[in-house]
């Protein structure tokens, strides 16, 4: 299977193989969602060559992350120390570890080529703040760790840009700050906690076609923070057609142009945070504060 541009299903040499890393001594293993997507059963081979049956604990398709669990002696499980992706610098040395082309426990060295890239996840949403590296990432590396020179986890190798299907010096990793936030949620409740305000947004294609800036509110859930704050969705006009709903154009002073942008800011703030929305209703601009709650 080949998908070249920002491929999340990179060319596979061995069907259904990928990489991962130990999260804790209770047997949790982190990998990419696209590595386990569609699989019925899974086995994990550790560095000591022991193999273990694995079960899926949880996953976040929108972030291309998944957590498995194996039953192995704690003495055989060495979790990776965690770094901080916000502190990364372009030019910093990084190491990619994985199983390229089925070659177990391979390590390649490179640098951080760029920060703040965006990728499309298997779930269709944007992944923000992605790390670009020239460390060789090949088929089979997906789900493996990207480390700094001190051996701390700074990202999860997820994708490559390649006309040929092999490494072209442009690889991408999900930042560890996202991993640190999501993995405990996946372990605790199988799915990520999604912060929101209780709205359904108008599809972006319709908003763009009508040259509507920001996130257009289509519906507001009853009893939600958005409803309590008085946000309005689309309304049917008497003569047919609709009145445009409120448009969210900024959150905490940061401009948002899409639902992905809005969700990203909400995720950074977290459930329980108070956010300040800049809303356009007709030609009037207003500022509204409301709390973020967990939404499905």
Residue positions per predicted region:
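Serine-dependent protease modules
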Residues: 1-212, 219-222, 240, 259-263, ...
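Conserved PDZ fold ligand-binding element
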Residues: 29-30, 228-259
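A structural signal for beta-strand boundary/capping segments at domain termini and interdomain linkers
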Residues: 51, 285-287
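C-terminal edge beta-strand
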Residues: 290-291
